[in-house]
């Protein structure tokens, strides 16, 4: 890895990793090469970017402390706002650089995703993006089958949170990092994609590989509980009906509301985030 990339990666990791995140560098060109122009990131190909994902540890290290600090405010989406807060700290830690941050949920006015998170994770070498095209002579006929990323250490027990772009920093010699193919057999890939598309509520697709760490039972219960009841589950008081202003020492942003992706997208590289019905948790 180039010294410049290693230095920036270390600084970003110092900001995010203590809170349960991982970061992976990639070139914008690697991402753009897989997609039609409408989905390209509008930066020179050698531009340095970092993919950010959350591990199971993020729940205890980042989300719960964030909720405890903000639980008397009306949060529209606590997980996304927690992630936005921590990604904002990356910008603060590198004030000398121009930084653009795209969260996984962001969309253009026409609802086109600003980043195709699973494609970015694949090209960054963070997680293998398993798709229908990875199954020879697949058994699904005319059914729509969405793809899913699997992490070599966490299986499906992680979430892609966004990308950090560094316009003006170009790394043409950065070597590509291939994602680890941790579900190599046809039978296991079929089981993974069927579990993700048809049985996602039971969490089992996330165990496509034996994970080093899973979501805790508390974390699973949190994401399986209706949003209005989640704070009570953690022993926190419910906020008042009117949003209170954020404190000056804990800034956070309000993400755009989420809407489902366009189910008519034909090319599998265009699948946004995690696409089956509203999943019980990230």
Swiss-Prot record:
Residues with Phosphoserine modification: 245, 247, 275, 279
Tissue-specificity statement: Widely expressed. Expressed at higher level in fetal liver. Also expressed in spleen, lymph node, thymus and bone marrow. Weakly or not expressed in peripheral blood leukocytes.
Cofactor note: Can utilize both FAD and FMN.
Region (Disordered): 234-282
Binding residue positions for substrate: 104, 115-118, 129-131, 149, 160
Keyword Oxidoreductase attributed: yes
Effect on the protein upon substituting residue 161 to Q: In MAHCC; results in decreased stability and reduced stabilization induced by cobalamin binding; has reduced affinity for cyanocobalamin and reduced activity in dealkylation of methylcobalamin
Xref: InterPro entries: MMACHC
Cofactor(s) it depends on: FAD; FMN
Catalytic activity: 2 cob(II)alamin-[cyanocobalamin reductase] + 2 hydrogen cyanide + NADP(+) = 2 cyanocob(III)alamin + 2 apo-[cyanocobalamin reductase] + NADPH + H(+); apo-[alkylcobalamin reductase] + an R-cob(III)alamin + glutathione = cob(I)alamin-[alkylcobalamin reductase] + an S-substituted glutathione + H(+); apo-[alkylcobalamin reductase] + methylcob(III)alamin + glutathione = S-methyl glutathione + cob(I)alamin-[alkylcobalamin reductase] + H(+); apo-[alkylcobalamin reductase] + adenosylcob(III)alamin + glutathione = S-adenosylglutathione + cob(I)alamin-[alkylcobalamin reductase] + H(+)
EC numbers, comma separated: 2.5.1.151, 1.16.1.6
Domain of life: Eukaryota
Cellular component, GO annotation: cytoplasm; cytosol
UniProt GO MF annotations: cobalamin binding; cyanocobalamin reductase (cyanide-eliminating) (NADP+) activity; demethylase activity; FAD binding; glutathione binding; oxidoreductase activity; protein homodimerization activity; transferase activity, transferring alkyl or aryl (other than methyl) groups
Main subcellular location: cytoplasm
Gene Ontology BP annotations: cobalamin metabolic process; demethylation; glutathione metabolic process
Free-text function comment from the UniProt entry: Cobalamin (vitamin B12) cytosolic chaperone that catalyzes the reductive decyanation of cyanocob(III)alamin (cyanocobalamin, CNCbl) to yield cob(II)alamin and cyanide, using FAD or FMN as cofactors and NADPH as cosubstrate. Cyanocobalamin constitutes the inactive form of vitamin B12 introduced from the diet, and is converted into the active cofactors methylcobalamin (MeCbl) involved in methionine biosynthesis, and 5'-deoxyadenosylcobalamin (AdoCbl) involved in the TCA cycle.
Entry's disease: Methylmalonic aciduria and homocystinuria, cblC type: An autosomal recessive disorder of cobalamin metabolism characterized by decreased levels of the coenzymes adenosylcobalamin (AdoCbl) and methylcobalamin (MeCbl). Affected individuals may have developmental, hematologic, neurologic, metabolic, ophthalmologic, and dermatologic clinical findings. Although considered a disease of infancy or childhood, some individuals develop symptoms in adulthood.
Family to which this protein belongs: Belongs to the MMACHC family.
Protein name: Cyanocobalamin reductase / alkylcobalamin dealkylase
Annotated organism of origin: Homo sapiens
Lineage start: Eukaryota, Metazoa, Chordata, Craniata, Vertebrata
């Amino acid at each position: 890895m180039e010294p410049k990339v290693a230095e920036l990666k270390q600084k970003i990791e110092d900001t995010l990793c203590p809170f349960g995140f991982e970061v992976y560098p990639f070139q914008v060109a690697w991402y753009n090469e897989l997609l039609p122009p409408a989905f390209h990131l509008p930066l020179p190909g050698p531009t340095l970017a970092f993919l950010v994902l959350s591990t199971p540890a993020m729940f205890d290290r980042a989300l719960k402390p964030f909720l405890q600090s903000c639980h008397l405010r009306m949060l529209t989406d606590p997980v996304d706002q927690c992630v936005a807060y921590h990604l904002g700290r990356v910008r603060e830690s590198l004030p000398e650089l121009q930084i653009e941050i795209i969260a996984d949920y962001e969309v253009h006015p026409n609802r086109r995703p600003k980043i195709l998170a699973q494609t970015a994770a694949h090209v960054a070498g963070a997680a293998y993006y398993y798709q229908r095209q990875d199954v020879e002579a697949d058994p699904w006929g005319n059914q729509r089958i969405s793809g899913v990323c699997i992490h070599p250490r966490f299986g499906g027990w992680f979430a892609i949170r966004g990308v950090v772009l560094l316009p003006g920093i170009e790394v043409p010699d950065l070597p590509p990092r291939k994602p680890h193919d941790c579900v190599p057999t046809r039978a296991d890939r079929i089981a993974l994609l069927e579990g993700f598309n048809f049985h996602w509520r039971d969490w089992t697709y996330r165990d496509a590989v034996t994970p080093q760490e899973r979501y805790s039972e508390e974390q699973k219960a949190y994401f399986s509980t209706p949003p209005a009841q989640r704070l009570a589950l953690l022993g926190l008081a419910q906020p008042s009906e009117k949003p209170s202003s954020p404190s000056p020492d804990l800034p956070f942003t309000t993400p755009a509301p989420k809407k489902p992706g366009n189910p008519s997208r034909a090319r599998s590289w265009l699948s946004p985030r995690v696409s089956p019905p509203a999943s019980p948790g990230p």
